[in-house]
Amino acid sequence: MPSLRPTLLAVAVLSAGLAACQPQTAPAPTETKATAAAPASDPAVDARLSEISQQWLDGWFRLNPVSATQIGKHDYDAQVDDLSAAGRQAQVDFAKKTLAALDGIDTSKLSRENQIDAAILRNQVQGDIWSVETLQSWAWDPQVYSGLAGGAIYNLMAREFAPMPERLKSATARMQKIPGIYAQMRENLDPARVPKIHAETVAKQNAGILSLIDTFITPNADQLQGEERKQLDDAVANLRKAVAEQQTWLDKTLVPNAKGDFRIGQKLYDEKLQFSLNSSLSRAEIKQRAEGELKRVRAEMYAIAQTVLKDKPNAPEMPADPTPEQQQKAIEAALELAYAEKPARDQVVDFAKQTLAQATDFTRKHDLVTVPNDPVKIILMPEFQRGVAVAYCDSPGPLDKGLDTYYAISPIPDEWTPEQADSFLREYNSRMIHLLSIHEAMPGHYLEGAHSVKSHSTLRSVLRSGLFAEGWAVYTEDMMADAGYLDNDPLFRLVQLKFYLRTIANAILDQGVHVDNWTKEQAMELMTKQAFQQEREASGKWTRAQLTSAQLPTYFVGAQEHFDMRKAVEAKLGDKFNAKAYHDQVLSYGAPPVRYVREMMLDEPIK
């Protein structure tokens, strides 16, 4: 997930956690390369693309300094993004200039790797233009600004990419500029277009930036002396005042006057889906496939229920050909067996550490994929990130070498009642936390990010695909269960399928909400009944579906493309197929959209 911390103009390609770790040894190929027969590329055209890519990277970092810090480009650590009308126009002009340069290239004369880079750069700049001119989230989504303000500090302070005094000086400069972000927010947002849920969420999270100051800045302030210390103290004091003033504006002006529709509608949704996913599947195809998978997976879960409930007292009726009600009751009864095993409310993070070690050992022992040696640290999710996702893998930027990857988990809030906490822990039971560690860390996001850093180009690293990353993470859940994780425990497979049902439901829910005008009741029925989610988890997802769009399907669509690609390569190689060699090769391309990896693996034209 990164997937999934907002910056204004980066479409979803940048949202899935920008990863980089130590390079791995190049994998052995799983096939004989047939590309030698392809026409040779023109070195001059390849060089021209390299020049355009570098110009785009330099300009994009300059225009998006908060994201640049996250990616590991530290020339602009004292700056923040300019979201004024002039700043937005500069973004559009720059993107159009890049697009014109790309139009001047004959892509058929590029190497296959460079054809991919040209395609993903084109998608990015077209998406940037569309985001400013058509989607216009700067005019209606306050999360753009709150995410930028929080990220401006967090991206500087969360990792030791430079000595603390140096980062504190950059933080001082950014804290001086954050009141300007708030001023642009008040200037740009049209309350009539701002959805109520967006306004309320940002009003609740507004003070979260102060917890970042208290966590990262104040305890380290004595590392600056003299005038530099005074500037930092003044910046903190002024920021506290600005946050309080912003809170008043949010509570008294924005929230009461927010009248926008959180549904973006079919036209914007279809366009955003294309830019965000860069997939070969259309919205209609995604829906058809997801609905088919929903039926198939529920049938498989019913078969497991028949096994684990056999001879249990008070087991429900489980005929060979069940009614929908019988299927529902049997699966629910089987899941109850898994829900009963859960950590205490204050032990979630410790248990996650244990599962991470177990999943890592299993992946190594079964030789599923090359496991890197880079450290993974489990941390509590920063306050300003809470409220949307339960956990995410926060990897260092592709240009920051050798730094820690964070596996961030949201603790159970102290104010939750025992009933609320129990609902959460039924969802995040012991087996589910195993799955979360597989998905987010090993061999999911963390491992994928560590492999992807050895990508062939900086552009590929910076524009790594959320579709590839999230799809890989879902694919690995199935891969681990197939390999017999937790001693082939049928309840682990049951919970894994339930976790996959969530992925399926995400894809159906997102277009249901934004295109088909679903009510909360329809959404909750899908999640709590058909996908067996707990009330609290489903309620959080309903909120997320309102606050985001074209991001929830990433997991399902990416997974389908990974499953399809593996089947295609297995069919081509037959007995020569080797899973570890396959996985290492899939991860060797630097996480572009899966469609391009498939074209490379199968020697198909890049298109």
Per-region residue spans from a language model:
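C-terminal motif of bacterial Sec signal peptides marking the signal peptidase cleavage site
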Residues: 17-20
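Bacterial N-terminal signal peptides that target proteins for export
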Residues: 1-9
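N-terminal maturation segment of proteins
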Residues: 22-607
